[in-house]
C-alpha cells in the first residue's frame, strides 16, 4: 500500500509576505493563552483530587454499581428479587433485627459490599478485575455521622478508579482563607518578578536610551535598503513591522519615525514606471537570474508599498473612529499626532509618485480629508492637490483627482469646504485649447509620389527610416513622453467634469458658500466654455445678481465671470452688457476701510476687463462716470486700495484721453452732476471735477500723495510730474499687493525720529524777554549786605 501523500502545500514567498506581523502576534498570544488555561485547569483538577482523597479517607465508602445494568426491565426484576429476599425478615423478632443492625454498622467493608452490591454480568470479566483491585485498597471504618455528599465523576489513576465526592458547600472561613492562599500562590507563579519603580529622571533617561537604540536600528535598515534595494528588499518588511511598536514609552515616536522613513525610502527606490502584475504565461516561462531577481524585487516592493498604505489608512481610521486598540499602547491623544504624520506622508506620496501603483487609492484617501473638520489636515490635503495640479503636465493624475472630488461634492449634497473647489483654479488647462480647427491640423501623408521618392531617399534608405521612426515611437511610449493629442483629450475630459460640477452648484445650490469659488472658477475657465452656453450662462448670472441673496463679493464674482466670458470667445456675440456695468458702478460704494480688501482686488480685475480691454465698446460718458466714482472711492479705503484705484484711474485717463476735462475748473456746464444716480450713462459726469485729488495730495501715505499729484498734472509720461518707473510699470493689482498692510507693516517704512537733545541752562542773552534779562543782570551785579532778619512783625500780624 502506498504511503499517504501530504496534500498540504508549502506556502509561497508571496503568501509569506502577505502574512502581517499582527496576525503572527495574535497567533502567539492565542497559543500562550491556551497554555495558561490548560495549566490552570490542571491545577484545579489536582486541587479537587486532593480534596476528594481527604473526603474518601474520612467518609463512608460508596458501593460501586455496574453502569451497564441500568435498563428499566432489569431494575424491576431486581426490585422484585429484593422484596422476595426481604420477606423472611418480617417473620423475625424485633430483638434479632436490632442486633443485626448493630452488627451491620461494625461489619467489614468486604461483608457490607457483598451484601449490598448487585449481581455482575458474567461476561464482563474486565469489570470484575477492576472491582478486585478496588477491594484490595485498604479502607478505614466510618464511625463519624454521615454528611451530605455530592457525587462527582470518578478519576482513573494507575491504581484504578478513585471515586470523587464533595460535601455540600458550607460557609467556612478556614476554607475561604485556604482558597485565597492557593489563588495567591498561583498568581505569584504566573506573575514574574515585579518591575522596580523608577523615578521620573531615571524613566526619562531610560526612554531616551530606548529611543536612541530604535533610531539607530531604523537608520541602519534604511541605509541598507538605499545602498542595495534589490538584495535588501526583505529589510523593508522588517522596517515596516516597526509600525506596530508595542513599547508604550517610545511607541508613538518610533511609529512616526518609521512612517517618515518609509515614505522617503519609497520616494527614492520606486522606479519611474508602473509595475504591472505578471501574466500566467510570463510566470511559466524560464528567465535569466537577473530578470527573475528584478521580478522578485518589483513584486516585493509593490506588496510592501501596499501594506504601508494600508497601515497609514488604518491609522487615520483609528483616529476618526476614536477607537482604542486592545494593546492600549497608544492613547487617544496620540492618535491625532500619528494621523497627522500619516496624512502628511500620503500627501507627499500623492505629489511625488503620480505614476506609480495605487495612486488612485491615495486619491480616494486624500479627497475626503480635504473636507475634514481639522483645519490643519484639510489645508495639508488641499495644498497637496494644488501641487499635483500645478506639476501635472499630461493631465492623467489631475483627471483622477477631479473625478473623485466631483463625486464627493455631489454625494455630500454640495455641503463641503469652499477650499475643495478652489483647488480647481490650479489646473493647467489654460495653455491648451479645447477645440482646434480642422484647417490647423495637418494630417501626415500616407503615401509619397514617385517624384518625391526619387528626389528624397532611396528604397533602402526609406526602409531604414521607417524602422527608425517605429523605434522612436516605441521609445516615446516607454518613456511616457507627452503626447499632444492625448494631452488635449485628457484636458477636455477634465474641463467637462469641472464645468458639470460648477453648473450643478449654480442650478441646485445658489445659496451655498461654494458659490464664490464656482464663480471664480468660471471666470478663469470662461474662455474655454462652448459658445452655445454663453447666453444661458449670462442669464443665470444676471438672475443671481438681481435676486439680492448674494453678498457684494459674490456679486462682483458674477460680474467678473460675465466679462471673462465676453472677453474670450464671446467677442463674436457683439453683446453690450450694460446691466453688468450698472451693477459694478452701484457696488463700488459698498467698499470702505472697514471691509475686507478682497473686494477691492476683484474690483480692480473687473475694471481691467470691463474698461481697459473693451475700450472700443465703452462710451465716453461711461468712462467719465467710472473715473469720478473711483476718485471718490479712493478717499474711503485703505492706503494700498487707494494706490490700486489711483493706478487704475491713471490707466483709464491714458486709455480715454478726452477724460482730461475732469481736471478743468470751469463753472459752467450742460447739466448738473448726479453723484447718487446708479446709471453711469446718465449721471452727467462731464459736469464735475476731480476735487478729490487735492484732498489725496495731503494723504499721510507718500505713494498716495505722488499718485494724486501725478493725476492733477494730467498723468504725464515725462517731465517733472511723471511717476518713477518702479510705480508706472506695475499694474494696479501688483501695486495693491505690494503696499498691503496685512502683515502690519508700513511700506515705505516710517523714518525714525531724531533723538531728543537734553536742554542746557543758558544765562544772559539766551533769554528772549529783554526785561527779564535786564532784571537778572541787575540783581546778579549787586553786592549782598549782611542785615539781621526779623520775622516777629509778620508773626504778630498773623496772630491778630
Swiss-Prot record:
Q: List the GO molecular function terms.
A: chromatin binding; RNA binding
What subcellular compartments does it reside in?
A: Nucleus, Nucleolus; Nucleus speckle
Q: Which Pfam families match?
A: CBF, NOC3p
Please list the residues that carry the modification Phosphoserine. 787
Query: According to the UniProt record, where is the region Disordered?
Result: 27-93, 160-187
Top-level taxon of origin:
Eukaryota
Q: Where is the composition biased (Acidic residues)?
A: 79-93, 175-187
This entry carries the following GO cellular component terms, namely:
mitochondrion; nuclear speck; nucleolus; nucleoplasm
Q: Where is the composition biased (Basic and acidic residues)?
A: 66-78, 160-174
Question: Record's InterPro entries?
Answer: ARM-type_fold (IPR016024), CCAAT-binding_factor (IPR005612), Noc3_N (IPR011501), Nucleolar_cplx-assoc_3 (IPR016903)
- Keyword line: Coiled coil, Isopeptide bond, Nucleus, Phosphoprotein, Ubl conjugation
Ranges in coiled-coil conformation: 451-490
Q: Name its GO BP terms in alphabetical order.
A: DNA replication initiation; fat cell differentiation
Say what the protein does. Answer: May be required for adipogenesis.
Q: Report the sequence similarity comment from the record.
A: Belongs to the CBF/MAK21 family.
- What's the protein here called? Nucleolar complex protein 3 homolog
- Protein source organism: Homo sapiens (Human)
Amino acid at each position: 500500500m502506498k504511503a499517504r501523500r501530504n496534500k498540504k502545500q508549502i506556502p509561497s514567498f508571496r503568501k509569506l509576505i502577505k502574512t502581517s506581523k499582527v496576525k503572527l502576534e495574535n497567533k502567539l498570544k492565542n497559543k500562550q493563552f491556551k497554555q495558561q488555561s490548560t495549566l490552570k485547569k490542571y491545577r484545579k483538577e489536582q486541587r479537587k483530587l486532593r480534596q476528594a482523597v481527604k473526603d474518601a479517607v474520612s467518609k463512608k465508602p460508596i458501593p460501586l454499581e455496574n453502569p451497564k445494568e441500568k435498563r428499566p426491565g432489569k431494575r424491576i426484576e431486581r426490585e422484585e428479587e429484593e422484596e422476595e429476599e426481604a420477606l423472611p425478615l418480617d417473620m423475625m423478632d424485633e430483638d434479632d433485627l436490632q442486633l443485626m443492625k448493630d452488627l451491620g454498622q461494625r461489619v467489614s467493608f468486604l461483608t457490607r459490599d457483598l451484601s449490598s452490591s448487585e449481581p455482575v454480568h458474567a461476561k464482563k470479566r474486565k469489570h470484575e478485575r477492576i472491582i478486585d483491585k478496588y477491594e484490595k485498597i485498604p479502607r478505614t471504618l466510618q464511625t463519624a455521622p454521615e454528611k451530605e455528599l455530592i457525587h462527582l465523576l470518578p478519576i482513573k489513576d494507575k491504581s484504578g478508579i478513585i471515586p470523587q465526592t464533595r460535601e455540600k458547600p458550607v460557609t467556612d472561613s478556614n476554607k475561604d482563607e485556604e482558597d485565597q492562599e492557593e489563588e495567591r500562590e498561583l498568581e505569584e507563579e504566573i506573575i514574574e518578578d515585579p518591575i522596580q519603580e523608577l523615578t521620573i529622571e531615571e524613566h526619562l533617561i531610560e526612554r531616551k536610551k530606548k529611543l536612541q537604540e530604535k533610531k539607530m536600528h531604523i537608520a541602519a535598515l534604511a541605509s541598507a535598503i538605499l545602498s542595495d534595494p534589490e538584495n535588501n528588499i526583505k529589510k523593508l518588511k522588517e522596517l515596516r513591522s516597526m509600525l506596530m511598536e508595542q513599547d508604550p514609552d517610545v511607541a508613538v515616536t518610533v511609529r512616526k519615525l518609521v512612517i517618515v522613513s518609509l515614505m522617503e525610502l519609497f520616494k527614492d527606490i520606486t522606479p519611474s514606471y508602473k509595475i504591472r502584475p505578471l501574466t500566467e504565461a510570463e510566470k511559466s516561462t524560464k528567465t535569466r537570474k537577473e530578470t527573475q531577481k528584478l521580478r522578485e524585487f518589483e513584486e516585493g516592493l509593490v506588496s510592501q508599498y501596499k501594506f504601508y498604505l494600508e497601515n497609514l489608512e488604518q491609522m487615520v481610521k483609528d483616529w476618526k473612529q476614536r477607537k482604542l486598540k486592545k494593546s492600549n499602547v497608544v492613547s487617544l491623544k496620540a492618535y491625532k499626532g500619528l494621523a497627522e504624520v500619516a496624512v502628511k506622508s500620503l500627501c507627499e506620496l500623492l505629489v511625488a509618485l503620480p505614476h506609480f501603483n495605487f495612486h488612485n487609492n491615495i486619491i480616494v484617501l486624500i479627497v475626503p480629508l480635504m473636507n475634514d473638520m481639522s483645519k490643519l489636515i484639510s489645508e495639508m490635503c488641499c495644498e497637496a492637490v494644488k501641487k499635483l495640479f500645478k506639476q501635472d503636465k499630461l493631465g492623467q493624475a489631475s483627471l483622477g483627482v477631479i473625478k473623485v472630488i466631483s463625486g464627493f461634492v455631489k454625494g455630500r449634497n454640495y455641503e463641503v469646504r469652499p477650499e475643495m473647489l478652489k483647488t480647481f483654479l490650479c489646473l493647467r488647462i489654460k495653455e491648451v485649447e479645447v477645440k482646434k480647427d480642422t484647417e490647423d491640423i495637418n494630417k501626415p501623408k500616407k503615401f509619397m509620389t514617385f517624384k518625391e521618392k526619387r528626389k528624397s531617399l532611396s528604397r533602402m534608405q526609406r526602409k531604414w527610416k521607417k524602422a527608425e521612426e517605429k523605434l522612436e515611437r516605441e521609445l516615446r511610449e516607454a518613456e511616457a513622453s507627452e503626447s499632444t493629442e492625448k494631452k488635449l483629450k485628457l484636458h477636455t475630459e477634465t474641463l467637462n467634469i469641472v464645468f458639470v460640477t460648477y453648473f450643478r452648484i449654480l442650478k441646485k445650490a445658489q445659496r451655498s458658500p461654494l458659490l464664490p469659488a464656482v464663480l471664480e472658477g468660471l471666470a478663469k475657465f470662461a474662455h474655454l466654455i462652448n459658445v452655445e452656453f454663453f447666453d444661458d450662462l449670462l442669464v443665470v448670472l444676471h438672475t443671481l445678481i438681481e435676486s439680492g441673496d448674494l453678498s457684494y463679493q459674490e456679486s462682483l464674482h458674477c460680474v467678473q465671470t460675465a466679462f471673462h466670458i465676453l472677453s474670450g470667445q464671446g467677442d463674436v456675440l457683439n453683446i453690450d452688457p450694460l446691466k453688468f456695468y450698472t451693477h459694478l458702478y452701484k457696488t463700488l460704494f459698498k467698499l470702505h476701510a472697514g471691509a475686507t480688501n478682497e473686494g477691492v482686488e476683484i474690483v480692480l480685475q473687473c475694471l481691467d476687463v470691463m474698461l481697459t480691454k473693451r475700450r472700443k465698446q465703452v462710451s465716453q460718458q461711461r468712462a467719465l462716470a467710472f473715473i469720478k466714482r473711483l476718485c471718490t472711492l479712493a478717499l474711503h479705503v485703505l492706503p494700498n486700495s487707494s494706490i490700486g484705484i489711483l493706478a487704475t484711474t491713471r490707466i483709464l485717463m491714458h486709455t480715454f484721453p478726452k477724460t482730461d476735462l475732469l481736471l478743468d475748473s470751469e463753472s459752467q456746464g450742460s447739466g448738473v452732476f448726479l453723484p447718487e444716480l446708479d446709471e453711469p450713462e446718465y449721471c452727467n459726469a462731464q459736469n464735475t471735477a476731480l476735487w478729490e485729488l487735492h484732498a489725496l495730495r495731503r494723504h499721510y501715505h507718500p505713494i498716495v500723495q505722488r499718485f494724486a499729484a501725478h493725476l492733477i498734472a494730467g498723468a504725464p509720461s515725462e517731465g517733472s510730474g511723471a511717476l518713477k518707473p518702479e510705480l508706472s510699470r506695475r499694474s494696479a493689482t501688483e501695486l495693491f499687493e505690494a503696499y498691503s498692510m496685512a502683515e502690519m507693516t508700513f511700506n515705505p517704512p516710517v523714518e525714525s525720529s531724531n533723538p531728543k537733545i537734553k536742554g542746557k541752562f543758558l544765562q544772559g542773552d539766551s533769554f528772549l524777554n529783554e526785561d527779564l534779562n535786564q532784571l537778572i543782570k541787575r540783581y546778579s551785579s549787586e553786592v549782598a549786605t549782611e542785615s539781621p532778619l526779623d520775622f516777629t512783625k509778620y508773626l504778630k500780624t498773623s496772630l491778630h
